[in-house]
Amino acid sequence: AVRRLAIRRHHTATHILHWSLRQVLGDHVKQAGSLVDDERLRFDFSHYDAVSEDELLRIEELANSLTLSNERVDSTESSKDEALAKGAIAFFGDKYGDRVRVLSAGPSVELCGGTHVSATGDIGIIKVISEGSVGANLRRIEAVAGTRTLNLLQQDRRVIADVARLVGSGPDDLMIGVQRKV
């Protein structure tokens, strides 16, 4: 049950990140592939340039704003033409029948037959852990959600505390301690 919930969190978070990427980078962003498991999510997308640190922060902020708003996540069935006419995003190369499932998570509306949480708040916090190139005009973003985000933050806190001890400072004035040692 814990593993399945983690997968549902990461799968729904993938849709929300796709929406956030399009809001920050532009409508040219299209999904090129993804991987979802209980540990993380990976999302490949079309984009012509590296995503800056500021853009990544805005993407995270938008995604987490949507998760924290605790919007209902709905899955409905309709004809493919009706879904597309209402603005649902379909993925190039995917084969769809005449009837499709439409996933709605706030402003994110996509064709998807996968498993999801029932409200965006069930995802928890989404944290982007990497972004990079995987080919010409193709980027990859990796992220975690839910308890994996908590685990990551706790791990980061331990590393910060260890480095602070090494440089003789507290975690809150770590940069000062590092600058003294450099």
Language model regions located:
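Active/ligand-binding-proximal structured segments within catalytic/core domains
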Residues: 1-45, 138
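A generic structural motif
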Residues: 2-4, 47-51, 132, 145-149
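Ordered, soluble secondary-structure elements with a strong preference for glycine-centered loop motifs
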Residues: 6-12, 49-57, 150-154, 168, ...
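Generic, well-ordered alpha-helical scaffold segments in large soluble proteins
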Residues: 16-24, 58-69, 108, 144, ...
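Terminal appendage regions of diverse proteins
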Residues: 28, 122-182
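Gly/Ser/Thr-rich beta-alpha loop segments that engage phosphate groups in nucleotides
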Residues: 28, 35, 108-110, 115-116, ...
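Short coil/turn segments at secondary-structure boundaries
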Residues: 32-35, 73-79, 176
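Non-catalytic interaction/regulatory segments
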Residues: 45-134
